[in-house]
Amino acid sequence: MFNKDASPRMNPVNPDDALLQRRKILQLAGASTLLCCVASSDLSAADALPKAGINAGDLLVTTRDDTGTPLKASDIKLGGKPLLVYPFDIDTKKPRSESRLNKLLLVRVDPKDLSEEARARSVDGVLAFSAVCTHQGCDVTEWKASEKTLLCFCHSSQYNPVNNGAVAVGPASRALPSCSLAEKDGVLVLASGISAKPGV
């Protein structure tokens, strides 16, 4: 025969205790979500500020160069694809920072097409801009020869290098930040830091 006393007893659940338990779980979930958001925003902020920046006097090396060979104006071809470069610290003999926000692009245009202001920032038609698109932060890597514009493939924003990196075709709404160039001992040197914060 079935013995009622042998069966496990169920304690009735107090609705107030259950509500308190749910609140604790939700508070813990909320706290952990907040902690994750704060941690990821700290990481984004750290990435947004390159450790050593882009400084006047820096040499320029390609992003593929492990030897630290400084670039000359003649290394950038007229009407060719932009060359992606990093600022190179002559004291440490290393790129200042390989943060993507430190990446610059060099492009060469016909000096006759440049305004006086742009010509003053260039060396033999070579201009330097941030390589980070101001729309969503993708790399600007292409040259659209038919339009003579720099092109970001992510959302097809185009920038006019002859017009100080102004937006030629959106969705980007802000010009590419730029740097002035000079020539020293036959190689390209940054004559200024970056004109505005790179990226979005």
Which residues fall in each region the model found?
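Short, locally clustered residues in the helix-turn-helix/winged-helix DNA-binding domain
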Residues: 30
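N-terminal twin-arginine translocation
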Residues: 19-24, 33-54
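Residue-level detector of bioactive/disordered segments in secreted/extracellular proteins
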Residues: 4, 38-39, 140, 154
